[in-house]
Amino acid sequence: MGVLIWFRHISKAAISHTIKKLTLATLLIVSCATAWAADFAKGLTASRAGDFVTALAEWKPLAEQGDAIAQFDLGLLYDNGKGVIEDDKEAVKWYMLAAEQGKASAQTNLAFMHATGQGVIQDNVYAHIWWNIAAASGSENAKGNKDILVKQMTAQDISKAQDLA
């Protein structure tokens, strides 16, 4: 009987300790998410106002920490020369990071870069692969773009793209 009381006491203490840890972890996550949202919102507000230098300053740390939305937005800035000198290779870098995390718009832009040879060697196989992935991720334009591209590809290239996708 004494063992059961001791076990109940230990269990309550362990549960209490676990709840405290979970509460602290939740607070940490919420505070980080709040800080992310504030920084991202500052960048978005700046971008909408045409202040792309500030947008870059707000989004770059988020992008470097792995945020796919910020990575995509940095890709757009470099792709279009907004707040930075236009740099297609840098745009491809950021699109690739976001695309690998499933960001359909980044996948679509990356496919376009491969199709046109912007920032990368022109490669219809990789353009096909990325438009295929973007279509699977929900991009409405990707399938149409891929269908247009297929008309310019050999049967061997189409087969290779399908095998690699």
Predicted features along the sequence, with ranges:
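Bacterial N-terminal signal peptides that target proteins for export
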Residues: 6-23
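Sec/Tat signal peptide C-region and signal peptidase I cleavage site
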Residues: 33-37
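Hydrophobic face of amphipathic alpha-helices that form TPR/SEL1-like repeat modules
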Residues: 39-46, 58-62, 73-80, 109-116, ...
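TPR/TPR-like alpha-solenoid signature
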Residues: 40, 72, 93, 108, ...
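Short helix-capping/linker turns of helical repeat alpha-solenoids
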Residues: 50-51, 64-67, 80-82, 87, ...
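Terminal, low-structured helical/coil segments at or just beyond the last alpha-helical repeat
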Residues: 141-165
